[in-house]
């Protein structure tokens, strides 16, 4: 029996990415955290990436933000994996990023930089607590 792994209401050509962070309690800097990203596609496939360790936690806002370079590197890694899985259509029409934190201008710039010249629109959504 074939299993349909298609996800409901997921658009073809869109690369969905969820960002999560884990603070590193034993680090010398209380802002130190690890970022991870889960990419999933319309066919139900998913891949988890470990992003960079760094001072991503902002105690004043209690949110996590990558710097521009780390955001660009993470998005570039995701896009590279997308290309491996879609050799006939190597760039997604849209990179849809969601996280519990808002996106800083610096972080957003890194995501946009990674998509520059690829015809990929970047969309971000902050997930609010219910």
Task: Place the predicted regions along the sequence by residue.
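Long, contiguous domain-sized segments
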Residues: 1-130
